[in-house]
Amino acid sequence: MTADAVLPNPAAGVADEVAAYPPAVDLRTMMAKRPLPAVAPGTVDASSLTGEEPARLARRVLDKLNASLAAGDAAGVEECFNASQAYWKDSVALTWHLRTFGTPSTIAASLLETSRLRGLSREGFQVDGDAHFDPMFSFIDCHISFATSSPATKAIGKVLLLPVRGGDGNQVEWKIWILSTRVKSLDVHPENEALLRQPGRAISGEQDFETQTLIVGGGNAAVVLAARLKALGVESVMVERYSQAGDNWARRYGSLQFHVPTSSTQTPFLPYDDSLLGRMLKREDLANHMRRYVAEFHLNILTSSRVQSSVFDTSTKKWTITIKTPAGRVTATARHVVQATGLGSQQPFVPKLADEGLYKGVAIHSTEYQNPEVSLKAKGVRSVLVVGSANTAFDVLQDVHDAGLEVTMVARSATFVFPVEYLDNPLALGAYNTAGAGADEVDRNILSLPTLVEAWLTKGLFASLARAEPEKDR
């Protein structure tokens, strides 16, 4: 097969070059080892699990868990969890990190240590609102809330409880299958959205400055973090290499778009315009929203600038950062430095091929691709080989095809392709479109599941949606 142009996908092969820590794992291998737990038919009477009964049962389990934690009883904590499969997923609430623990013994040891370090309140984990029984999976789904004292926080989460028959085969006990915990707010620094409207600082790039937090980058993560910090009363300054916020999108290829529903990508404090909710976000939508975000909230940003070096002083507990700006070099001092420079997908990876010099056609990386006219047709290209099968590869494939060029995709391994409408299903990311469902509430439900469990549920959902459309080509 020959082609006039070859466009490698930016993500293709990166994993082969950079060692991951923790080591990368194959989700399919994990799924094969850990199927979802099965509840035998007739284990519980669904008709009895209505009204206040699910909440009462959940409260009984939580009371036992709280008592065991207070007593430092590892065996008692372990006994609260489902022996065959259990998870605890924490999002900053108790571990100050994003962690998922497996096996009851590991969960028990980790809960005992972190609840002590964070000062879990005397009340412990409490039922928060209603609980309900899911007849399809036979679990009780219950929201929870709790508080800590070190630091003083309010936190939320949920528990999923499974029915387990006791040793005599008759008695049914409810055990925790999944415990999810997530910090909601800091008591000492509650968010104040009114602070977002206060003027920012005049950062010229000519004078040294001091700030509480220096953020390296000016993309989505950077500007959202800057806004969050400002609402908490914490000053920050972003250092962005391009001439304005949003250029990390605006400078990429013209056909770029998100591959998930817009409603599931909302930004805090300033949502996307309603006119964008019915379609996928495109390059211009993303860039314009970032610029609007910075302007409306008067966020501090130093553009066309790059960090040259950084040194941490252990005595003052401060960073000294040297920054190259259009006006020269300035020095910034900050208590905290946050790197918000993305996942590295814009670092080109081009596989080394034997005798690659023999190929005389156009060979570019997708980071160099603009559009079919400028990047390909103007150079006489008529056929294109796209190497890779991630989102960028499909964007380019569609773009080149629509321009009337012959195009072929080469993928290293099988790629799971499904209709984008599946993602918009109310049981998937379409939950964000549900009338009356706030993003925080949907986040609380969707983000509570361990990745492995979410993978199993998504696989089952997509399989059922596919079975409902037998006329579609597979």
Report the location of each language-model feature.
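Short, low-complexity N-terminal intrinsically disordered segments enriched in polar/charged residues
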Residues: 2-75, 79, 202-205, 209-211
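Short beta-strand edge/turn micro-motifs at domain boundaries
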Residues: 5-37, 145, 151-204
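A solvent-exposed, acidic/Ser-Thr-rich amphipathic alpha-helical stretch
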Residues: 55, 59, 67, 71-136
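Feature captures the FAD/FMN-dependent oxidoreductase FAD-binding
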Residues: 118, 122-169, 174, 279-345
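Glycine-rich dinucleotide-binding loop and its adjacent helix/turn
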Residues: 178-218, 232, 267-276, 282, ...
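Glycine-rich FAD pyrophosphate-binding loop
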Residues: 227-254, 405-418
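Conserved N-terminal glycine-rich FAD pyrophosphate-binding loop of Rossmann-like flavoproteins
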Residues: 243-269, 275, 416-436
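Dinucleotide-binding/catalytic capping subdomain of oxidoreductase cores
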Residues: 280-288, 394-474
